[in-house]
Amino acid sequence: MDELKKAMKIAFAIKAQNFHWNVEGPLFPQLHMLFATVYEEVYGAIDDFAENIRKLGSYTPASFQRFSMLTQVEDELNMLEDRAMIAELLQDSDKMVKLLKIVFDLSEQAGEHGLSDFIAGRMDAHRKHSWQLRATSKE
């Protein structure tokens, strides 16, 4: 169950929103929109994560302390240059895909096919984020 809770991605969404708010440089318009697309899409799935956790009979994490204990994403306290923001968010998105794959495999083993379907959709969304970030980082 902790793997599913780790996959909720609160910290990832907050980081993408931080980058959306604070990006600067010649790519500002494009990156501002890209980071918004990422954080809005991720935030949009958080309630579904919580409901899937509840369907399995567990309580959802609902405090900053609990989220920080579960996160797989490092907090970014410094203001980064635009290229570093892309690289860091890409690395985190790739981490999320790996974590989601673990959750997918566990849900399949448990016969929780509805959860597997949801997680497969989340993996696809993060692969798309990774692709867009990777393509944006090309010189």
Name each region found by the language model.
Residues 1-4, 8, 34, 85-88, ...:
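Non-transmembrane, amphipathic alpha-helical segments
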Residues 6, 13-16, 20, 46, ...:
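A structural signal for well-ordered alpha-helices, especially hydrophobic packing surfaces
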Residues 12-38, 99-114:
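Helix-loop segments that flank and shape redox-cofactor active sites
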Residues 27-66, 136:
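Conserved alpha-helical segments that form or flank metal/cofactor-binding pockets of metalloenzymes
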Residues 34, 74, 128-129:
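Alpha-helix boundary/interfacial micro-motifs
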Residues 47, 51, 71-121:
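Acidic/histidine-rich alpha-helical segments that form the ligand environment
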